[in-house]
């Protein structure tokens, strides 16, 4: 199992819409998350001192090929449709890698 932390901005005028979407995630999206070996998935919201709201996600990956599982998720028509509602709410960080939407974070501490 590998733990992942990721961050992305959220457009201030879209915070309530994003929260509404995630209060009722589509069942097929949840099934795809499970099918792609993601467990214990949470998203947190916080407005920082710069006034910008950010989303922090945490999940545990239990599969053997993260890239293949993420490609499987990205190819799923229902997931693509879900993302078409979520992405306009998000504001990617300027310093993200070319292939990133959410920015990966470095784990600096963990305790069970």
Task: Indicate where each model-derived feature is located.
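Active-site-flanking beta-strand signature of metal-NTP-handling nucleotidyl enzymes
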Residues: 4-9
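Short amphipathic alpha-helical segments
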Residues: 14-39
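Short, glycine- and small/hydrophobic-rich beta-strand elements in well-ordered beta-sheets
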Residues: 30-56, 60-66
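An amphipathic, aromatic/His-enriched active-site/gating alpha helix that lines ligand/cofactor pockets
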Residues: 36, 60-101
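Charged phosphate-binding loop/patch that engages nucleotide di/tri-phosphates or the phosphate backbone
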Residues: 96-112
């Amino acid at each position: 199992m590998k733990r992942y932390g990721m961050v992305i901005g959220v457009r201030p005028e879209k915070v309530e819409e994003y929260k509404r979407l995630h209060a009722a995630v589509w069942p097929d999206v949840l099934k795809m998350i499970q099918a792609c070996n993601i467990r214990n998935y949470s998203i947190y919201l916080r407005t920082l001192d710069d006034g910008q709201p950010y989303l922090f996600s945490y999940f545990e990956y239990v599969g053997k090929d993260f890239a293949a599982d993420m490609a499987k998720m990205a190819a799923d028509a229902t997931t693509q449709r879900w993302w078409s509602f979520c992405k306009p709410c998000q504001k990617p960080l300027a310093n993200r890698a070319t292939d990133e939407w959410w920015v990966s974070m470095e784990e600096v501490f963990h305790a069970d």
